[in-house]
């Protein structure tokens, strides 16, 4: 707007007719006062418009920065809260992990101790069973050998006279059994 008015004054001054002379050395004080007053008036309006625009821009920038600061502070506060919560959760997980490990260790230890007791009992039972089995086999072998020796000895000593004597004793026992009354 100021530039348009200034161009008009230049055109008028170059027309060589009635107008405003913009050459400072050729003008008189009145013309100079009019030019300076006009420049001051339009310059003041332009400058005040520029200053108002700049003021609005600066205020807007300050408000934006203030908003960003508040937003950043809010984000920082939320981040600190999240960090504290994460630290608490990590501590809780760590303590739960330690507790779980200790419980698991106790459970495994008691399970191993029970397994050891069971194995010892099984070992004792197997040893007893094997001992009884061995004793039975030894007894059976001894009995078999004793019977064979006794039979061999009896067969060696057996003659007709002893044979008759044994038969007679057996017959007496049988007859005594028949004579005994049954109640």
Swiss-Prot record:
UniProt-listed InterPro entries: ATP_synth_b/b'su_bac/chlpt (IPR002146)
Keywords: ATP synthesis, ATP-binding, CF(0), Chloroplast, Hydrogen ion transport, Ion transport, Membrane, Nucleotide-binding, Plastid, Thylakoid, Transmembrane, Transmembrane helix, Transport
Record's protein name: ATP synthase subunit b, chloroplastic
Keyword Zinc in annotation: no
Domain of life: Eukaryota
Disulfide-linked positions: none
Mode of membrane association: Single-pass membrane protein
Extra remark: In plastids the F-type ATPase is also known as CF(1)CF(0).
GO molecular function: ATP binding; proton-transporting ATP synthase activity, rotational mechanism
Spans through the membrane: 20-42
Entry GO CC: chloroplast thylakoid membrane; proton-transporting ATP synthase complex
Location(s), subcellular: Plastid, Chloroplast thylakoid membrane
Function: F(1)F(0) ATP synthase produces ATP from ADP in the presence of a proton or sodium gradient. F-type ATPases consist of two structural domains, F(1) containing the extramembraneous catalytic core and F(0) containing the membrane proton channel, linked together by a central stalk and a peripheral stalk. During catalysis, ATP synthesis in the catalytic domain of F(1) is coupled via a rotary mechanism of the central stalk subunits to proton translocation. Component of the F(0) channel, it forms part of the peripheral stalk, linking F(1) to F(0).
Family from the record: Belongs to the ATPase B chain family.
Quaternary structure and interacting proteins, as annotated: F-type ATPases have 2 components, F(1) - the catalytic core - and F(0) - the membrane proton channel. F(1) has five subunits: alpha(3), beta(3), gamma(1), delta(1), epsilon(1). F(0) has four main subunits: a(1), b(1), b'(1) and c(10-14). The alpha and beta chains form an alternating ring which encloses part of the gamma chain. F(1) is attached to F(0) by a central stalk formed by the gamma and epsilon chains, while a peripheral stalk is formed by the delta, b and b' chains.
Keyword Chaperone among UniProt keywords: no
Phylogenetic lineage: Eukaryota, Discoba, Euglenozoa, Euglenida, Spirocuta
């Amino acid at each position: 707007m100021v530039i348009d008015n200034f161009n008009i004054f230049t055109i008028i001054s170059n027309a060589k007719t009635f107008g405003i002379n913009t050459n400072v050395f050729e003008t008189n004080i009145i013309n100079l006062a009019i030019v300076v007053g006009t420049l001051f008036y339009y310059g003041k309006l332009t400058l005040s418009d520029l200053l108002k625009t700049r003021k609005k821009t600066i205020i807007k920038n300050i408000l934006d920065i203030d908003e960003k600061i508040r937003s950043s502070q809010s984000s920082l506060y939320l981040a600190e809260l999240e960090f504290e919560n994460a630290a608490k959760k990590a501590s809780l997980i760590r303590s739960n992990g330690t507790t779980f490990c200790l419980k698991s260790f106790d459970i495994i230890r008691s399970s191993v101790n029970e397994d050891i007791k069971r194995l010892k009992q099984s070992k004792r039972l197997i040893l007893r069973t094997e001992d009884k089995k061995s004793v039975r086999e030894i007894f059976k072998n001894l009995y078999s050998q004793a019977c064979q020796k006794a039979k061999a000895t009896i067969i060696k000593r057996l003659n007709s006279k002893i044979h008759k004597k044994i038969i007679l004793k057996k017959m007496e026992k049988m007859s005594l059994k028949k004579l005994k009354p049954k109640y």
